[in-house]
Amino acid sequence: MLKVGLSGIHPLTQRYMLSKSVSKREFKMILNHVSVGVSDVPSAVFFYDSVLSALSIKRAHYIENVAAAYGENFEFWVGCPCENAASSGNGTHIAFNAPNKEAVDQFYVTALELGGECAGKPGLRPEYGETYYAAFVRDVDGNKLEAVFM
């Protein structure tokens, strides 16, 4: 059985933490931030402002027509690529924590309403963990996004 206090952490990571007696407070992410390239920054900012607000994630910074950052520590960025046109990474996706299942559902609905594509309807994903509830979408540039509640 998993210890209380590990919600929001992937089940495989939870197992590792428990096997090594690592607390959530001691656990450090290896990434500082992630960014995705978009073809139209203002349109992408509207899309991400709307979709991420369903997960209680707010835009924290904006450089007009260049990039926008989300999260308290600017963990997620959308922006125009420095070189060449924006293209999505095959096999890449960004997963955002959701506060509850309803937020996952709202993330999915909002993304589709704004021109995103379904990449996996909201539902339980027992192959990732007993309580892993997620939805997958692609933004208008083809970037794959996930909202997950555990």
Give the label of every model feature segment.
Residues 35-76:
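Core segments of cupin and vicinal oxygen chelate
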Residues 85, 102, 114, 145-150:
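Long, contiguous binding/interaction regions
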Residues 5-8:
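Residue-identity detector for glycine
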Residues 23-45, 94:
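N-terminal beta-strand motif that seeds the catalytic metal site of vicinal oxygen chelate
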Residues 38-42, 96-140:
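Vicinal oxygen chelate
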Residues 11-28:
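Short, Lys/Arg-enriched N-terminal segments with co-localized hydrophobic residues
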Residues 26-29, 84-88:
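Short, flexible turn/loop "capping" segments at secondary-structure junctions
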